[in-house]
Amino acid sequence: MPPDDRLTAVLPPVRDGDIAPPIDVVRAALEGSPPPKPPPPPPPGRGGGGPSGPGGPSGPGRQFRINWKWVRRGSAIAVAVMVLLPLITFGMAYMIVDVPEPGDIRTPQVSTILASDGSEIARIVPPEGNRVDVKIDQIPVHVRDAVMAAEDRDFYSNPGFSWTGFLRAIKNNLFGGGGLQGGSTITQQYVKNALVGDERSGIGGLIRKAKELVISTKMSGEWSKDAVLQAYLNIIYFGRGAYGISAASKAYFDKPVEQLDVAEGALLAALIQRPSTLDPAVDPEGAADRWNWVLDGMVDIGALSQADRDAQVFPPTVPPDYAFQQNQTTGPNGLIERQVTNELLDLFDINEQTLNTEGLQITTTIDPKAQEAAVDAVDKYLEGQDPDMRAAVVSIDPRTGGIKAYYGGSDANGFDFAQAGLPTGSSFKVFALVAALQQGIGLGYQIDSGPLEVNGIKIGNVEGEGCGTCSIAEALKRSLNTSYYRLMLKLENGPADVAEAAHDAGVAESFPGVEHTLSEDGKGGPPNNGVVLGQYQSRVLDMASAYATLAASGVYHKPHFVEKVVNSSGQVLFDASKEDNGEERIDKAVADNVTSAMQPIAGWSRGHNLAGGRPSAAKTGTVQLGDTGDNRDAWMVGYTPSLSTAVWVGTTEGVKPLVNKWGSPIYGSGLPSDIWKATMDGALEGTDVESFPKPTEIGGYAGVPQAPAAPPPSAGPPTDPGQPSVTVIQPTIEVAPGITIPIGPPTTVPVGPPPGAPGAPVGPGAPEVPVAPGAPGVPGAPPPP
């Protein structure tokens, strides 16, 4: 076919503007990059389908158009969210949050320790500060008005919060402004201090403020306004370590809150804003300005007339140091506070943190008269002595176990010697006598007082003192080591029986620092022979308690300080008078016979009979300082039917000789007996003179034999002839006209059998042999020469 010579039209290729060129797509795939997007096609011109010219929509003359309808809708939604979301959140929080009942919120507050007559001994001030809660009706109305004038003038009408204060908090925390600022109501301030804390800046501060707002609002609906105001006035800080209006009243004016006048109440209200810097002792002008502002506020709210306001005078305050000292327990009372606190923790099985929130009023068994007598006696007889000399005194009521006097030292924060473990010397012989009587050995049982030797160790009495073969009652009076060592060996279980009798009477089986008392191995094993001579450690408290058991005819009462405990709400938590802690530990006949044997000893010990011929039963004790021949400790323990008192005298470390101001050795019949007599006489002055019960028979003897008598066949070896009558001559020296003092031990002159007759006494009245604890072979015996 011949070629077609007709003209053909060449059409350009049709391209889809949304599809990239194939070559570009392949190249992009090979290079691992996204394919390029083609440029958008030009929009059509205004006039139709041709290319747009300069005046088309793509040119610079195009305007961006705002859809105001959607803007209005979005703004409305945002405002709704900003308003509704906080309200919804507030409502949910209001429903969820639990507001405690009035009185359920525990805040640290002071507990007061009182003597038996209601006088104050000490105050237990918690670390968080000094606070004593009071009821709203104890706070004068004008004081309440002053606080409202200073802090919340529409307190009784507002809903518990301030919107202006809350909005200011939002502004300051979101945009700066120095942290949260004033405007809080009294309710909000209370919630902040008691429940939500005091974070003051940033988002945390804003959250805290929101919590405060919710709780304050709900609290205002559930608590009465008086309950809120009472709680607030008991928790707010006033400076000088005083939390609450009651403590502040004492800290600034040294008076109870009930006695505050208008001017004083206005000053305390003025301090709330800046308690430390507005203290009149720090900034008197600033305090006066704020005080005047509060008084003017009282006029504004109608709580004070202008005439009364004009009559007010700025009140004087006590020095800040005085307020601090009021919260510090000093002298021996500090050690009483320590023991009362420990007893409370044990009594209620609580910790100190819990104790510090109770605001307790603790009435103790301490008798102010007995306490004063003990302190005065120690001060009198230790005056002028070695500065290292120390003393301890404990007096206990045998009928209850109540501690009537307690002296462990003069330093409130120092070492308490009444709680120290100390060797007791011959005062422990009493428990050997208890054990002997329990085994049927009567007071008339005769025993040799001559020297003896055990395992190569010689045991003797001071200056060769002895009574030949005499009764165990006479040997106790003379404090003969040799006689009681032999008596202990005669017991069924020897030293173990002595220890058991001591524990039964009230010597503690353990105390802080000593896991097992009266134990040679310290692990509860048996004691050795030195126990009869007081080798092992006991406390002054324990000795007073054990002797009190004898005074009570064998009935033990646990020694205690706490008589009654009342909390800040007036609820009685404990009343010792309703507790029955008496327990018969020792047979009555045994205890009464021991008392009979001890009755002559106070007079025998250098004339320490009690005033007015009051009967007493007592025993001295002296402990030797190692193998030096000097003394280390000296004791006097004794009682009447109504009071048992133990006295110890020694030195701070127990490593130096115990001598008086004249350089003479101190024995139990010396300074300790002086202190004991002065304490007992002072404590018992004005009380009835009581007699001890008449003992019943044990081993053929009812009490101390009054005439020679042969012991029953089972009681032991035959007796020596009876003891002759003696006249006691006490050497004295006149130190001033008409005033004499004794010097040295008394001398006796026999008026019965001639000197040297069997059983005649030798040197009675001499002090007992000091006991050397830990001597080799026979603990408690003097070392070999």
Swiss-Prot record:
The chain crosses the membrane at residues 77-97. It catalyses: [GlcNAc-(1->4)-Mur2Ac(oyl-L-Ala-gamma-D-Glu-L-Lys-D-Ala-D-Ala)](n)-di-trans,octa-cis-undecaprenyl diphosphate + beta-D-GlcNAc-(1->4)-Mur2Ac(oyl-L-Ala-gamma-D-Glu-L-Lys-D-Ala-D-Ala)-di-trans,octa-cis-undecaprenyl diphosphate = [GlcNAc-(1->4)-Mur2Ac(oyl-L-Ala-gamma-D-Glu-L-Lys-D-Ala-D-Ala)](n+1)-di-trans,octa-cis-undecaprenyl diphosphate + di-trans,octa-cis-undecaprenyl diphosphate + H(+); Preferential cleavage: (Ac)2-L-Lys-D-Ala-|-D-Ala. Also transpeptidation of peptidyl-alanyl moieties that are N-acyl substituents of D-alanine. One of its GO terms (biological process) is proteolysis. InterPro entries: Beta-lactam/transpept-like, Glyco_trans_51, Glycosyltr_51/Transpeptidase, Lysozyme-like_dom_sf, PBP_transglycosylase, PCN-bd_Tpept. Disruption phenotype: Probably essential. In a depletion mutant growth rate is dramatically impaired, cells are short with bulbous poles and/or rounded internal regions. Residues 392-662 are annotated as: Transpeptidase. The active site is at E151 (proton donor), S426 (acyl-ester intermediate). Residues 1-61, 605-626, 690-726, 738-785 are annotated as: Disordered. It is a single-pass membrane protein. Residues 33-45, 708-721, 743-758 have a biased composition (Pro residues). It holds the Pfam family Transgly. Cell wall formation. Synthesis of cross-linked peptidoglycan from the lipid intermediates. The enzyme has a penicillin-insensitive transglycosylase N-terminal domain (formation of linear glycan strands) and a penicillin-sensitive transpeptidase C-terminal domain (cross-linking of the peptide subunits). This is Penicillin-binding protein 1A. It comes from Mycolicibacterium smegmatis (strain ATCC 700084 / mc(2)155) (Mycobacterium smegmatis). The lineage of its organism: Bacteria, Bacillati, Actinomycetota, Actinomycetes, Mycobacteriales. The gene is ponA1.
